[in-house]
Amino acid sequence: MFGIVSGLLSHPIAFFESSEALRQKRGLVTADGMGETFQTNVFGHYLLIARLTEAMAGGRVIWTGSAASQLQFKACDYQHVWGDKPYESSKYIVDQIAVPLDQRLRPFGVRCLVAEPGNVCTNFLAGLGLPLFEYLVVGVFYFIRFVLGIARFTINADSGAEGCCYAALADEECVDSRIKYHSQVTRTGKAYVGQFPLVQNKDTAAFLMGRLDGLVKRFDEPK
């Protein structure tokens, strides 16, 4: 609680733009022996792409990006099983592999892009069984967006989909795998697409592609 209050008082805009307030569990591993968040957000999709590449001609792979931090990524624990921020680490991996994966898929007529939906209010509070509280929280988010002008506070799903729709439907000459397409809104809720360069390290990208390809081979081996 102290961390939340401190974040709100010291850096309110950056606080709301991150997942700083979320508590994430360490040591979560799937039945396949992988970090749970890593397999959910990265490898499951990567494996699907690897197996369907030849059937995807003319299509696009749109990764959903989010808060990504190099500070949370460690090569020795690239699946971030034992770190504090597995979610941020998984999104950092997405940013790193987007360009080399796009280069690999292009000969098949497939593009690989990253879009970010911003902060969308989903049913994450539904488990509390307090619908009025949910409405209150959403109302507070609208108020904060209007007062502070936080462009990534898309709040509703339609506005949050703006970046993904652009990445999926824009003409070929209008998209670039080195760009992340952000869903953004004005204070009053008018949606638009912000374009920002991906922060990428080529050595890290090559390392991650090698690890992911190795995991794909492991899954393709006869049991």
State the predicted function of each range:
Residues 1-125:
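Rossmann-fold NAD(P)H-dependent dehydrogenase/reductase core
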Residues 66-223:
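NAD(P)H-dependent oxidoreductase Rossmann-fold/reductase module
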